Amino acid sequence: MAGHSQFKNIMHRKGRQDAVRSKMFSKLGREITVAAKQGLPDPTMNPRLRLAIQNAKAQSMPKDNIERAIKKAAGNDGENYDEVRYEGRGPGGVSVIVEALTDNRNRTASNVRAAFTKSGGALGETGSVSFMFDRVGEIVYKSSVGDADKVMEAAIEAGADDVQSGEEEHVIICAFEDIGEVSKALEAALGEAESIKTIWKPQTNTELDEEKARSVLKLLNVLEDDDDVQNVYTNFEVSDEVMEKLSA
C-alpha cells in the first residue's frame, strides 16, 4: 500500500480530533481567502475559489466560516499570503514537497527547515525533488457512490486517466489542466465529490521499514501542525505489515 493517504489515516485515527478539525478549518479558510483575493469573490466566476469552497463543504466547514473567509479577502486587514513551495529529503531518502500560504516567508522557511533537520532529513532547493512527481488533478468520492465498475465507467466517460478504488473511497486522477471539465462531468454522473484538488503524484515510490516510516510520520506531523503549511506530499510506501504496526 503506497502514498501519503496511509499516514493521513493513521494521523486521523490517533489524533486530537478537535484540534485537528480546528486547524483544518483555519487552513481551508486561508485557501478560500487567497483564492477570493486572486480572482473574483464569486465562485461561479473563479474556479479556484469554487474548488476551495467545495472542499471546505466536504470537510463540514460551517457556512459562516466560509462566508467570513470570502469577506476577509475584500477587507483591508493587511493580510497578504504568498504561495511558497519547499522541497527536500526526509528519513530513508523519501522525497517531500511542502506547499505553504504564508504572510512571513522567513518564519515559514525557518520552521520547515527545522522540521526536516530534526527528522534527519534536509531541505533542498526548489526543483530538487519535484521532477520526480507529476502535477495532476485528484477527485475523491466515497465508496457509497457505487462499485468500482460504475466509477471506472464514469471516469472514462469524463476523460480521467486513472481510478483507484478501495474500501472507503474512489480516487480519480486526471490531467492537471482537465480538472475543471473532468470534475464537472463526474458530478453529473456521480454527484458532488468528497474533494477536488491538484496534487503532486509521485512517479515512483520509496519503500520504508518500520523505523524509517515512524520517522517520516513524525516529520509529516510536525509539518502539518504548522499553520502556514497547506499540503505535504511524499513518495513513500510501506508494507501492510508495517502499516498495521503504525496503526496500532
Swiss-Prot record:
Gene3D superfamilies: 1.10.10.200, 3.30.70.980
Presence of keyword Protease: no
GO MF annotation list: DNA binding
Main location, first listed in the record: cytoplasm
GO CC field: cytosol
InterPro entries for the chain: Integrase-like_N, TACO1_YebC-like_2nd/3rd_dom, TACO1_YebC_N, Transcrip_reg_TACO1-like, Transcrip_reg_TACO1-like_dom3, YebC-like
Keyword Transcription regulation: yes
Keyword terms: Cytoplasm, DNA-binding, Transcription, Transcription regulation
Subcellular localization(s) per the UniProt record: Cytoplasm
Residues annotated as signal peptide: none
Biological processes per GO annotation: regulation of DNA-templated transcription
Pfam family, one: TACO1_YebC_N
Family indicated by similarity: Belongs to the TACO1 family.
UniProt xrefs under HAMAP family: Transcrip_reg_TACO1
Entry-linked PANTHER family: TRANSCRIPTIONAL REGULATORY PROTEIN YEBC-RELATED, TRANSLATIONAL ACTIVATOR OF CYTOCHROME C OXIDASE 1
Protein name listed in UniProt: Probable transcriptional regulatory protein Oant_1200
Organism of this sequence: Brucella anthropi (strain ATCC 49188 / DSM 6882 / CCUG 24695 / JCM 21032 / LMG 3331 / NBRC 15819 / NCTC 12168 / Alc 37) (Ochrobactrum anthropi)
